[in-house]
Amino acid sequence: MFMNDQVYDLLRQAVIASRTLVDMSNKTIKNILRNTADHLLENQNTILEANAEDLSRIDPSDQKYDRLKLTKERLQTMADDMRSVAVLSSPIGKVLHEITRPNGMLIRKVSVPFGVIGIIYEARPNVTFDVFSLCFKSGNACVLKGGSDASLSNHALVNIIHQVLQKYRININTCILLPPNREVTAALLGAVGLVDLIIPRGSSSLINFVRNNTRVPVIETGAGICHTYFDKKGDKDKGRAIINNAKTRRVSVCNALDCLVLHRERLNDLPYICGDLQKNNVIIYADEPSYKVLVTCYPANLIQLAVEESFGTEFLDYKMSIRTVNNIREAIDHITRYSSKHSECIVSESPKTINFFLQKIDAACVYANVSTAFTDGSQFGMGAEIGISTQKLHARGPMALEELTTYKYLIEGSGQIRS
């Protein structure tokens, strides 16, 4: 068993490593990240073998399976995202505000790294690479606590990172992978003074556990209970494409659609709007008005009457609910009640209705005529993301380089003293 003292010894090494990153040039960081991306692809067979062994312990019907699975295409995406991060400008040392006081004192507010960032995540080995690239680029050491389901995949990926760091004679404790034991999680959450920030990424139960048990500051990457409101002035072709994409592109991700909110005047368009959902065997939990329409045309084994639990659920599966409303205000009320404040969408051709929706919906990402599948750091031009924050303090939405920095004030003078 890994003891607390062993965890704290590793964290102290991460603190030491984080101090060495301050002096590293952006050019060196860029070269290391590019080399790591190349090294990943050169060793993809090794990674896929480790991943296959992890997958062999999971039922393919389990929601975790798709999140855990790595393919050559996904490894290519991971490498591309790392290269995208590499070429971004450094978020460190930026002058955020500058003022010269009447007494001649110069005050500058300058961006700096947090120091050591702990990431707790589940069966998502791609997170390992995303986290390292973003933390390294922003001058932070990262401490990774992955789930046991992905332990072999994570270990293989961190080995790739360490091999490149050693090539450049960089302290490998810049990126530490902790054992996947629960006792280690408790030690990490109590590491005040060693870890500057914890970011949990995973299920609502994981996030709630971290929130309720940590002594270290946390930025939550919350569950995604996502809605799309199809307005009475919505384009049915756009709506069909957006709804299907948001639901079926990848059902296991946090930006996937969970509930279609439908204006009552568009009930007759529902069979057309749901046409692609039927092709993808999406199970629909429909309220009474939408059920009466769909029961005549949607496969009987894929349609059920909704109950209260059908709403406010993050399905992470080929399942969704439908709620019928009389107007935009009812739509907003429903979304406000059940939303996790992640990503919400309206499909409408009315500028007035769109603006009202964008202003009134309280979520990290609010879309008009765009699939919620775009809530992603790479799609926002950030290179990659460390998670989607659903809280409001410090960071909200896709968290990338800027969100992994804090700031300090630099004050210069010529001998000023305060009266």
Curated annotation (Swiss-Prot):
One of the record's GO molecular function terms: NADP binding
InterPro entries per UniProt: Ald_DH/histidinol_DH, Ald_DH_C, Ald_DH_N, G-glutamylP_reductase_CS, Glu-5-SA_DH, GPR_dom
Source species, domain of life: Bacteria
One Gene Ontology term from the biological process aspect of the record: L-proline biosynthetic process
Stored CDD domains: ALDH_F18-19_ProA-GPR
UniProt-listed SUPFAM superfamilies: ALDH-like
Keywords noted in UniProt: Amino-acid biosynthesis, Cytoplasm, NADP, Oxidoreductase, Proline biosynthesis
PROSITE patterns in UniProt: PROA
Residues that span the membrane, as ranges: none
Pathway participation: Amino-acid biosynthesis; L-proline biosynthesis; L-glutamate 5-semialdehyde from L-glutamate: step 2/2
Catalyzed chemical reaction(s): L-glutamate 5-semialdehyde + phosphate + NADP(+) = L-glutamyl 5-phosphate + NADPH + H(+)
Entry's localization field: Cytoplasm
EC assignment: 1.2.1.41
Cellular component per GO, a single term: cytoplasm
Family: Belongs to the gamma-glutamyl phosphate reductase family.
HAMAP family from the UniProt entry: ProA
Task performed by this protein: Catalyzes the NADPH-dependent reduction of L-glutamate 5-phosphate into L-glutamate 5-semialdehyde and phosphate. The product spontaneously undergoes cyclization to form 1-pyrroline-5-carboxylate.
Protein's name according to its UniProt entry: Gamma-glutamyl phosphate reductase
Species this protein is from: Azobacteroides pseudotrichonymphae genomovar. CFP2
Gene name tied to this protein: proA
